[in-house]
Amino acid sequence: MGPGPPAAGAAPSPRPLSLVARLSYAVGHFLNDLCASMWFTYLLLYLHSVRAYSSRGAGLLLLLGQVADGLCTPLVGYEADRAASCCARYGPRKAWHLVGTVCVLLSFPFIFSPCLGCGAATPEWAALLYYGPFIVIFQFGWASTQISHLSLIPELVTNDHEKVELTALRYAFTVVANITVYGAAWLLLHLQGSSRVEPTQDISISDQLGGQDVPVFRNLSLLVVGVGAVFSLLFHLGTRERRRPHAEEPGEHTPLLAPATAQPLLLWKHWLREPAFYQVGILYMTTRLIVNLSQTYMAMYLTYSLHLPKKFIATIPLVMYLSGFLSSFLMKPINKCIGRNMTYFSGLLVILAFAAWVALAEGLGVAVYAAAVLLGAGCATILVTSLAMTADLIGPHTNSGAFVYGSMSFLDKVANGLAVMAIQSLHPCPSELCCRACVSFYHWAMVAVTGGVGVAAALCLCSLLLWPTRLRRWDRDARP
């Protein structure tokens, strides 16, 4: 809910943030963005292709991370609100951000490093148990940093224009983070991978991922946490959380009756009885499935189905992200011209075109760059539009907006983890690093996560066209 008109004698509005303060805030999520890019793009590839763990084992670890993230996100938000009176001098939000940052810094490098104390005779289940606690700690830290950083926006600024500006700066550094990860991955694969090739060794062997690439991913994770730690330090040095006033006690001039509001409040229990809540929620979930699963399985598709050199696991995701970033600038004018639903549908058409291209083409070759442009543009279109649809659904009911976002976030994270586990369970050679069946498996997995889920998203969109989102009026004094 936006601020009302200033009352007589009210304190003046806070001064706008300086450019340094705005930039300091914007870099506070840089570490999370770096880690998230590496987590979704390279975790399965590292565990299965480099560490030679079974496909089910790799999928189980990713599922553990997604479930831990989904559970920690609402719990951290609840505890952060409860602890608002703690750490008053430093700021409760910054304190939670610091806790999350430390957890991420201490746990993330171990996820992309060999199991300490494990040998050739160590059973796989023991290695998976070793990685499990580090993944849970990382996801707890990631959620703590994300929630505290987002909740700082209304603490730092009150003007809607400044809120949009902070969000835009935050997204700009997200772009920089993804470019940094993919650029560093390409550089490490190019330099460190080629330096290990002996003069008598076939050059094609150096283009295949394997145990020799463990230092590449270990160094990439160390680079990620090193750079992220510097930006997190800049955030804590340059961001000052404003002190919250204590709960206001009723005074002499406080009206006994609250003024009537034009719009009744929607509580969390009311959302559960709104069909539109489930319509938009399922659409958002399918959108996230397309975006995250295509990012997760793109590296596997490039490696096993197209047999491309390993540098492509860095260059193709980079092309996808740049394509999506550039296409996001077209979202506002397109939305104005054809509306939310048709904008989302246009993005789906682009993704379905990519899926059809992959399904029908025997080998893409260099054309994989053009396909990556299509997928990146389509994913950015449906993701931005689905977020706008969620904001439209909440509308003026911001008092329960956190419940809506939290519910949809929990649903999409758990669904992503379960989907990955299901795909990994169908892997034709779970006990081998790769076999002939992998070629067609990852080919059709890529078609399924884009085309198959895209069809499901189209059906959800049709339900919104047939039954537009309309919220009923609820009497907050009425019993549910």
From Swiss-Prot:
The chain crosses the membrane at residues 27-47, 57-77, 98-118, 125-145, 171-191, 219-239, 280-302, 311-331, 348-368, 369-389, 403-423, 447-467. It catalyses: L-cysteine(in) = L-cysteine(out). Widely expressed, with high expression in primary melanocytes. Changing residue 113 to A: Does not affect phosphorylation by MTOR. The modification N-acetylmethionine is found at residue 1. GO terms for cellular component: late endosome; lysosomal membrane; lysosome; melanosome; melanosome membrane; plasma membrane. Residues 48-56, 119-124, 192-218, 303-310, 424-446 are lumenal. One of its GO terms (molecular function) is symporter activity. Keywords: Acetylation, Amino-acid transport, Lysosome, Melanin biosynthesis, Membrane, Phosphoprotein, Transmembrane, Transmembrane helix, Transport. It is a multi-pass membrane protein. Changing residue 254 to A: Abolished phosphorylation by MTOR; dominant-negative inhibitor of cysteine transporter activity. It is found in: Melanosome membrane; Lysosome membrane. The modification Phosphothreonine is found at residue 254. Residues 1-26, 78-97, 146-170, 240-279, 332-347, 390-402, 468-480 are cytoplasmic. Phosphorylation at Thr-254 by MTOR via mTORC1 pathway promotes cysteine transport in lysosomes, thereby regulating lysosomal cysteine and cystine storage and redox homeostasis. GO terms for biological process: carbohydrate transport; cysteine transmembrane transport; melanin biosynthetic process; negative regulation of melanin biosynthetic process; pigment metabolic process involved in pigmentation; regulation of melanin biosynthetic process. InterPro entries: MFS_2, MFS_trans_sf. Belongs to the major facilitator superfamily. Transporter that mediates the import of cysteine into melanosomes, thereby regulating skin pigmentation. In melanosomes, cysteine import is required both for normal levels of cystine, the oxidized dimer of cysteine, and provide cysteine for the production of the cysteinyldopas used in pheomelanin synthesis, thereby regulating skin pigmentation. Also catalyzes import of cysteine into lysosomes in non-pigmented cells, regulating lysosomal cystine and cysteine storage, which is essnetial for redox homeostasis. PANTHER family: MAJOR FACILITATOR SUPERFAMILY DOMAIN-CONTAINING PROTEIN, MAJOR FACILITATOR SUPERFAMILY DOMAIN-CONTAINING PROTEIN 12. This is Major facilitator superfamily domain-containing protein 12. It comes from Homo sapiens (Human). The lineage of its organism: Eukaryota, Metazoa, Chordata, Craniata, Vertebrata. The gene is MFSD12.
